[in-house]
């Protein structure tokens, strides 16, 4: 027997891109009562004075008309500024490297937007993320990696709670990106040929250094090796991240062994940037980390220990870890030393295909000693 989906209302977050367009199309084809909503999170114009949000909204309108669904625009600029951008700036001020996409999903797309969707009578919200939702026999929702390994976005969704996931659909999770493009082209959607957006949501394609300098004054300082050699001047600690290679302005010639130079540490109090030679420089290696803002996708005890795998940045293979959880904090011990564990970034836990949740890295340690990363 066919399920009658017509009484189930799904509000789709539509960005004007191909993924969210196909999300809306698939749900409409499956018979759901679909409404499209465009979120305006950032007041912006590109370098030609064109408001990119206006262009994106036109694409949403065109696709919604093609599919035959109602659509609205909602303004979350204040919520975005207060909950995501202020956090982003505070992290950079404290010498850390934040991941605003993780916070945007937690606070905007699956909180502010979810709340708004409920006022439209939504049973569920849906987005174009590459992740999968599976409900077990007890009604508990499990979040699984997207089938397209190169596009899986569970890393960025790792702060979602069971409550949020219960109300969420990810219709693209079982598809390859190439299939999504093909569906859009076959349906003749206005966004079928539109290129994917890159970069942080509110910066887009702009130069990151220039953008950041509008909001945080840069303080130049000394660039040093760990053993105290002065290597010149840095442009401001906020412009560098642990393990970074480019943009240092020092070639291999100063080191004697011609290995490339990397950022290996920061001292915020002295405004010193530490650099060292070699991809696996000893200062870049650590054996454990402390994390806070720990969120699991399911109900868990206040204190427990977990053997699983983890990612410490988006595009990296999983590593085996032991996680000691206490309330919203965790100590994560690595089976093998890890490179460039960066405070402010997300650590995300997995059990096979399932994303279990994650937290924000506060400090890395090497054999119990804190690494000089902030």
Curated annotation (Swiss-Prot):
Span list, region Interaction with tRNA: 151-153, 313-314
Known catalytic reactions: S-sulfanyl-L-cysteinyl-[protein] + uridine(34) in tRNA + AH2 + ATP = 2-thiouridine(34) in tRNA + L-cysteinyl-[protein] + A + AMP + diphosphate + H(+)
Disulphide bridges: 104-201
Name of the molecule in the record: tRNA-specific 2-thiouridylase MnmA
InterPro entries: MnmA-like, MnmA-like_C, MnmA-like_central, MnmA-like_central_sf, Rossmann-like_a/b/a_fold
Keyword line: ATP-binding, Cytoplasm, Disulfide bond, Nucleotide-binding, RNA-binding, Transferase, tRNA processing, tRNA-binding
GO terms for MF: ATP binding; tRNA binding; tRNA-uridine 2-sulfurtransferase activity
Active site, UniProt feature: 104 (nucleophile), 201 (cysteine persulfide intermediate)
Organism (species): Streptococcus equi subsp. zooepidemicus (strain MGCS10565)
């Amino acid at each position: 027997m066919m399920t009658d989906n017509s009484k189930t209302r799904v509000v789709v977050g539509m960005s004007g891109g191909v993924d969210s367009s196909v999300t809306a199309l698939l749900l409409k084809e499956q018979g759901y009562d679909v409404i499209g909503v465009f979120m305006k999170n950032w007041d912006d114009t590109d370098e030609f004075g064109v408001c990119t949000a206006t262009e994106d909204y036109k694409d949403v309108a065109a696709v919604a008309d093609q599919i035959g669904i109602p659509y609205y625009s909602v303004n979350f600029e204040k919520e975005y500024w207060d909950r995501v951008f202020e956090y982003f700036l505070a992290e950079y001020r404290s010498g850390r490297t934040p991941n605003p996409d993780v916070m945007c999903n937690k606070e905007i797309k699956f909180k502010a937007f979810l709340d708004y969707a409920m006022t439209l009578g939504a049973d569920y919200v849906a987005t174009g993320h590459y992740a999968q939702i599976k409900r077990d026999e007890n009604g508990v929702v499990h979040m699984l990696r997207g089938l397209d390994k190169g596009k899986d976005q569970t890393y960025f969704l790792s702060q979602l709670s069971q409550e949020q996931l219960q109300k969420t659909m990810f219709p693209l999770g079982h598809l390859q990106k190439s299939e999504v493009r093909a569906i859009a082209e076959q349906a003749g959607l206005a966004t079928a040929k539109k290129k994917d957006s890159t970069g942080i949501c509110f910066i887009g394609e702009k130069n990151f250094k220039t953008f950041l300098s509008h909001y945080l004054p840069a303080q130049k300082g000394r660039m040093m090796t760990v053993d105290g050699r002065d290597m010149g001047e840095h442009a401001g600690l906020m412009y560098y991240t642990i393990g970074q290679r480019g943009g240092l302005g020092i070639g291999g010639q100063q080191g004697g062994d011609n290995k490339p130079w990397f950022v290996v540490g920061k001292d915020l109090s002295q405004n010193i940037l530490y650099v060292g030679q070699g991809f696996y420089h000893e200062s870049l290696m650590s054996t454990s980390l402390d994390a806070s803002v720990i969120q699991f996708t399911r109900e868990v005890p206040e204190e427990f220990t977990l053997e699983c795998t983890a990612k410490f940045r988006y595009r990296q293979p999983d590593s085996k870890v032991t996680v000691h959880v206490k309330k919203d904090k965790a100590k994560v011990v690595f089976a093998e030393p890890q490179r460039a564990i960066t405070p402010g970034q997300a650590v995300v836990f997995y059990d096979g295909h399932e994303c279990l949740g994650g937290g924000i890295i506060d400090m890395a340690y090497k054999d119990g000693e804190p690494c000089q990363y902030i």
